[in-house]
Amino acid sequence: MGSQVWVVSTLLISIVLIVLTIVKLKFHPFLALLLASFFVGAMMGMGPLEMVNAIESGIGGTLGFLAAVIGLGTILGKMMEVSGAAERIGLTLQRCRWLSADVIMVLVGLICGITLFVEVGVVLLIPLAFSIAKKTNTSLLKLAIPLCTALMAVHCVVPPHPAALFVANKLGADIGTVIVYGLLVGLIASLVGGPLFLRALGNRLPYKPVPAEFANLEVREASTLPSLGATLFTVLLPIGLMLVKTVAELNMEKGGTLYTVLEFIGNPITAMFIAVFVAYYMLGIRRQMGMGVLLTHTENGFGSIANILLIIGAGGAFNAILKSSGLADSLAVILSNLYMHPILLAWLVALILHAAVGSATVAMMGATAIVAPMLPLYPGVSPEIIAIAIGSGAIGCTIVTDSLFWLVKQYCGASLSETFKYYTTATFIASLLALAATFLLSFII
């Protein structure tokens, strides 16, 4: 009993340490996670060199796979940004008369969010919400909240987004399967947490015009944007290649030439690599961008990923320390005695960590470290489902600790209480619906 108390206390104190150092002391999450790693190692009796070796292997093992995918994904997202491909998707959906404006914003967020970091997606796509709001005299809240909820949902549950890819990789989940489940769950969660929730409010949702300081932000002219076909082909190509790999694994015998080829092109690194050169041509060279210009855009894109790479690397170190110290195995036994369903536990841990730390990425990595050790005790629950459950939890509770909360507040010209009342509630409802959809999927498949 005493050893169990020690294990639980060590884990809880390490989580509190992460939260306090990030929120109160303003540490970068990279430093906070490394500090927590050393703390756990020391508390569990690991030697100094043993701790350092575990941290090195954790960072190297995590980034060895993810660094290339994140780097390639950044290039793809940058090409979407500079070419106007994301705006093309939005303008095309606007022409669908049978789609309401709020549903259009959800679909724009889901499709464009596949290749864009969530904050970048908000900054890039919010002019579309401004444009629609001005044309239709609609409250900006009714458009911006569905957009941001959809972007957050994709960020949390759909690889190749870094956090979703990290979770799938650590749990040993099939990435193609996680993509399919994630898109389905993300769509349901975004539609209910965004449009349906806001429509249910009716006249209680205040009218918010486009703030004066953003009045000059406009969507580019349609004639300057790439075609819809080129845009969708570029966005969906890496997803399609990864899904082909999954289909091959389910339906073909291993070892054949075709199987090997499909495994190769469907590997996330290869799929993203192919997609980058397709994007260079379809969204760049074909539109009179020279290789010098593309190089500049690539370098500019790489400047933004050091932050996420370091955080994910430190998350890998924290996971490695939990395993090497023996805390993970002890924790698995303790959690199995709680009689809480692993899907609910995964969701709840990610939800609480996101609210506490303010980073969905850090929350998902922390939840993975806590939940992963107990998976062997539940062979009936697939790692793909647990990956979606963790992402579903991270969608919710976007509060003042999260930079996205402040982005929404600023762009919508909303007060603090209004942002809490409408946006935070929307993300929590989306998270609950994602949890329900995940449970439903676990019963069906």
Model-identified regions with their sequence ranges:
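Structural signature of hydrophobic alpha-helical transmembrane segments
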Residues: 2-11, 62-71, 117-121, 184-187, ...
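Long, contiguous bundles of hydrophobic transmembrane helices that form the permeation core
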Residues: 2-5, 180-296
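Hydrophobic mid-bilayer segments of alpha-helices in multi-pass membrane transport proteins
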Residues: 7-19, 26-46, 67-72, 230-243, ...
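Hydrophobic alpha-helical transmembrane segments
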Residues: 8-13, 31-34, 67, 102-107, ...
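Membrane-embedded alpha-helical segments and adjacent helix-loop junctions characteristic
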Residues: 48-135, 288-375
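Alpha-helical transmembrane segments of multi-pass membrane proteins
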Residues: 99-114, 137-156, 174-187, 342-354, ...
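Membrane-core helix-loop-helix motifs of multi-pass transport proteins
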Residues: 131-239, 405-441
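C-terminal transmembrane helix pair
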Residues: 186, 342-445
